Amino acid sequence: MHYDKNKTKQTEKRCLDALSKYGDFKMSEDEYSPFDLYGYTNNVKTLIEIKERSEMWDRWYIEKQKIDNLRKLKHKTKDPLRIYLMIVVGNDGFLFKVDDIFQMGKIERIRMNKQTSKDFPQSDIKIRKEIINFHHQLNLLKLKLND
């Protein structure tokens, strides 16, 4: 999938709007942050990473390193911290607890293109990556996002 910075920011804003009734969230200003939204729910600091997908699947795949990076943040603080992954498909947002993904997901090592197939359709550069494969029914909450 080709990275479109404007579309990504629009998706983050849509998620921010949909989550406003659950807490006070802001968009991360750091482009390289491991999370996209941060704020508080019931006075507990909350971080949310957003991933957009083009289709709905029974099982989702995410790089294990992304989940590990989010979990490290939780272990670095003594304060309570909630960390979620939100997968967006069209106008639906699915919220998952990162700890649930780690505990209930299946870790696999797969070979994948180093670059996206859209940007480099003939790429034969393959690397091995660890991914976590988890069921969509692990989601805690399904949100409707506005256009």
For the regions a protein language model found, what residue spans apply to each?
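Nucleic-acid nuclease catalytic cores
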Residues: 75-101
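Acidic-basic catalytic patches of nuclease active cores, encompassing PD-(D/E)XK
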Residues: 1-29
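Beta-rich catalytic cores
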Residues: 33
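Mg2+/Mn2+-dependent nuclease catalytic core
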Residues: 53-76
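Intrinsically disordered, low-complexity terminal regions enriched in charged/polar residues
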Residues: 94-147
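Ribonuclease/tRNase effector modules and their secretory precursors
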Residues: 2, 89, 144-147
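Conserved catalytic cores of phosphodiester-cleaving nucleases, focusing on short active-site segments
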Residues: 19, 37-54
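A structural signal for short, well-ordered beta-strand segments and their strand-loop junctions
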Residues: 27, 47, 84-87
